[in-house]
């Protein structure tokens, strides 16, 4: 068995085209284009790369992109004041704070400061709570992007045993909630989990997000499983790989996402979907 590749680049491009069309329809109807404010604190090269990609994507589909590049020594109070200004700016539909933030700034407090209806990353406790209550509004981008990939490939996951390896607030925990909402029986593993191999071997659907290259050997993959690799790891030789041993896993899985080109593009695609959704909420309110 050789797994079918789940092409995140292709699906992400489809979504961008769909959103661009909807934006043009809004503009023709006399409505404003969606506006996303992206806040970058400091000079982390990876964060700068991600922010540049997000801004270019927004502009390419007709969004208004506002850039706020703050110095590394900005205080938490100053950052919170900027968020308050963006919250009350009626022309701004979405606010994105690029993570991680510098040492000394409380990530949770900053994310909680964003108005829930402008929280296009889906990290605010209100939006996470709505997801837990089976009434999602703005959903965390990477987990929602995974669900979209499965939907676009017509992969039925209802009733499957889903195992999420990694329990981060950004990916693992909301991923578990998304899979539960989709009808899976969900296990979330973490650093205290015993017998990780046994859990992985029982997974009909495996989602891995730990940030460790090749962490899951292909021999652990259940034959015919669906493998979603969210990890992005850069090796010393410059090669980018995921958390799953791809060359081994592809021989056992039924479907698998590559790294790069799998889940990564879907995160940005979901961000623009969320921003358009936030824009629609603003018009209705």
Curated annotation (Swiss-Prot):
UniProt keyword annotation of Cell inner membrane present: no
PROSITE patterns given in the database record: THF_DHG_CYH_1, THF_DHG_CYH_2
Record-listed NADP(+) binding positions: 166-168, 232
GO molecular function annotation: methenyltetrahydrofolate cyclohydrolase activity; methylenetetrahydrofolate dehydrogenase (NADP+) activity
GO biological process, one term: L-histidine biosynthetic process
EC numbers: 1.5.1.5, 3.5.4.9
Pathway given in the UniProt record: One-carbon metabolism; tetrahydrofolate interconversion
Subunit structure of this chain's protein: Homodimer.
Physiological role: Catalyzes the oxidation of 5,10-methylenetetrahydrofolate to 5,10-methenyltetrahydrofolate and then the hydrolysis of 5,10-methenyltetrahydrofolate to 10-formyltetrahydrofolate.
Family of this protein: Belongs to the tetrahydrofolate dehydrogenase/cyclohydrolase family.
Name this protein carries in UniProt: Bifunctional protein FolD
Source organism (scientific name): Baumannia cicadellinicola subsp. Homalodisca coagulata
């Amino acid at each position: 068995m050789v797994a079918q590749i789940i092409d995140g680049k292709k699906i992400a491009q489809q979504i961008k085209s769909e959103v661009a069309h909807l934006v043009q329809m809004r503009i023709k109807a006399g409505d404003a284009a969606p506006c996303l404010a992206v806040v970058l604190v400091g000079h982390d090269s990876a964060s700068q790369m991600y922010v540049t990609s997000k801004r270019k994507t927004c502009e390419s589909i007709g969004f208004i992109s506002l850039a706020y590049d703050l110095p590394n020594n900005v205080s938490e109070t100053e950052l919170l004041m900027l968020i308050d200004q963006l919250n009350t700016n009626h022309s701004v539909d979405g606010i994105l704070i690029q993570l991680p933030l510098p040492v000394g700034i409380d990530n949770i407090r900053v994310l909680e400061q964003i108005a829930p209806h402008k929280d296009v990353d889906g990290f605010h406790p209100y939006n996470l709570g709505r997801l837990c209550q089976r009434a999602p509004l703005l959903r965390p981008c990477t987990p929602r992007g995974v669900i979209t990939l499965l939907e676009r490939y017509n992969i039925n996951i209802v009733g499957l045993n889903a195992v999420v390896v990694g329990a981060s607030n950004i990916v693992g925990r909301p991923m578990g909630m998304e899979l539960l909402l989709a009808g899976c029986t969900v296990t979330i593993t973490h650093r205290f989990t015993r017998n990780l191999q046994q859990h992985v071997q029982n997974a009909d659907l495996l989602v891995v997000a730990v940030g460790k290259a090749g962490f899951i050997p292909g021999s652990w993959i259940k034959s015919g499983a669906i493998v979603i690799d969210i990890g992005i790891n850069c090796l010393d030789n410059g090669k980018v790989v995921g958390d799953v041993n791809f060359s081994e896993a592809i021989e056992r899985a039924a479907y698998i996402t590559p790294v790069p080109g799998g889940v990564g593009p879907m995160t940005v695609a979901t961000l623009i979907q969320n921003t358009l959704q936030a824009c629609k909420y603003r018009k209705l309110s």
